[in-house]
């Protein structure tokens, strides 16, 4: 699924985006953000992040730097702290 979504974004970049004016208000561009979000977080969460970003890309938003958030490690700290508090 990730490959299909990223492939769709790459087709957009190659065949549509290059013929439209540069209007993205963010860095990285929304399409580059979408690819990175899907690569980092998977198809579902990455698509959600990309759609959320695209919804902010309009003339009434100031734009600017907006990077994909890092992937959080699942329960890495919480398991350690829970084990530290149990005394057997």
Curated annotation (Swiss-Prot):
It comes from the Bacteria. It is found in: Cell membrane. Keywords: Cell membrane, Membrane. It is a peripheral membrane protein. It holds the Pfam family YidD. Residues 69-82 have a biased composition (Basic and acidic residues). GO terms for cellular component: plasma membrane. Its main location: membrane. Residues 66-88 are annotated as: Disordered. InterPro entries: Membr_insert_effic_factor_YidD (IPR002696). SMART domains: Haemolytic. HAMAP family: UPF0161_YidD (MF_00386). Could be involved in insertion of integral membrane proteins into the membrane. Belongs to the UPF0161 family. This is Putative membrane protein insertion efficiency factor.
């Amino acid at each position: 699924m990730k490959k299909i979504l990223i492939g769709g974004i790459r087709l957009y970049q190659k065949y549509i985006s290059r013929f439209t004016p540069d209007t993205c208000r963010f860095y990285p561009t929304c399409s580059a953000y979408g690819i990175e979000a899907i690569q980092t977080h998977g198809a579902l969460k990455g698509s959600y992040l990309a759609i959320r970003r695209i919804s902010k890309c309009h003339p009434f938003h100031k734009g600017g730097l907006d990077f994909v958030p890092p992937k959080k490690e699942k329960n890495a700290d919480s398991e350690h702290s829970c084990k530290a508090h149990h005394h057997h």
